[in-house]
Amino acid sequence: SQESTKWSNWKKNWASYSSQYEHVSLTPGADETKLNYAWYSKTAETPKVRISTKQNMDGATEFTGAQTEAVTIDDTKYFSNKVTVSGLKENTAYYYQVFQDGAGQDTQHYTTQAFDEFSFLYVGDPQIGASKGQTSSENEKMENAGNVVTSAPEKNLAARNDSYNWNNVLNEALEDHSDVSFLVSAGDQVNYGSNEREYAGYLG
């Protein structure tokens, strides 16, 4: 079935998914005209985001932010980057490019909704990794590495399964409510705050 194929592919690619610590997160700003960007990078640099109403990025405005040292994983140091974009207009299609690890990343798309009337999705407690100690339908014991980042497969099964279900829930919710402006997750987002693999699954 399509679902079993999706699950098989998720398991096969989980090592790659869970070690991708550089996803970009977008969150609402202080008001409707602002948008916050946050991401990890491996390079000490000034974080930048370029934004334009043109897909080819003509006339783009560049915003800079702040960077701090975040975590070290497998001897690799990661930096936390935060940038706020301002001056956004309602009901407008934008294109943006994040500057990460010394290069501009692929251009992405973002559309603002009406400022005075909008809807959003509210979810709670994805808590990636919380299924630890349970036994899966495939008779696997769900283990969790706690506040430790490890590549050992048997220590990441809880995060793997929870992330898969979380992604499915989000995709289905957004398919059913494609007009929402944003999503609010009340938390807990992950089971262990220092386990970056759980965050990778949450953001993936």
Q: What is each stretch, according to the model?
A:
Residues 4-204:
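Divalent metal-dependent phosphoesterase catalytic cores across multiple superfamilies
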